[in-house]
């Protein structure tokens, strides 16, 4: 009897923060694959308005969410940027378990993996008007409700790390502080 090869997918994102659209995408990818590697991209960046959370904080957001959803067939891998696009896929391969298929809508990521002969699939956009990291961060800064845009464990992590205060402070300029 021939055993079936496990099909493993790769997804990369900054997840600043991990939101309900990301969760839906993970579920859809897992409906087509046995397991998923979630690359926490730009892992070296934190404490900026665009990248307010550390790789470790994003890891907590994602792992707690997936645990609550009873999803266990995943790997979380922090992936730092490299300054040479031609080397990036090799960098990813060195950091992750082997994978068969890549899911992305990013044109550069798509191109780089296709050049290395990976199967690359597009992701469905889920409630893109509300569920984007940029929009959620803007809501946090403006004091608007954002909690319904992210899974409950993400809300908990952001409160634990005082993330709202952090992103609001990061969004001010030195002129704001001196006035």
Swiss-Prot record:
CDD domains: NMNAT_Archaea (cd02166)
Organism: Thermoplasma acidophilum (strain ATCC 25905 / DSM 1728 / JCM 9062 / NBRC 15155 / AMRC-C165)
Enzyme Commission designation: 2.7.7.1
Family named by the database record: Belongs to the archaeal NMN adenylyltransferase family.
Highest taxon listed in the record's lineage: Archaea
Alphabetical list of InterPro entries matching this protein: Cyt_trans-like (IPR004821), NMN_Atrans_arc (IPR006418), Rossmann-like_a/b/a_fold (IPR014729)
UniProt key word ATP-binding: yes
Keyword Membrane attributed: no
Pfam families assigned to the protein according to its UniProt record, in alphabetical order: CTP_transf_like (PF01467)
HAMAP family in the cross-refs: NMN_adenylyltr
GO CC terms, sorted: cytoplasm
GO biological process assignments: NAD biosynthetic process
Localization annotation: Cytoplasm
Gene3D superfamilies per UniProt: HUPs (3.40.50.620)
This protein's pathway: Cofactor biosynthesis; NAD(+) biosynthesis; NAD(+) from nicotinamide D-ribonucleotide: step 1/1
Record key words, sorted: ATP-binding, Cytoplasm, NAD, Nucleotide-binding, Nucleotidyltransferase, Pyridine nucleotide biosynthesis, Transferase
A GO term, aspect molecular function: ATP binding
Catalytic activities: beta-nicotinamide D-ribonucleotide + ATP + H(+) = diphosphate + NAD(+)
UniProt name for this protein: Nicotinamide-nucleotide adenylyltransferase
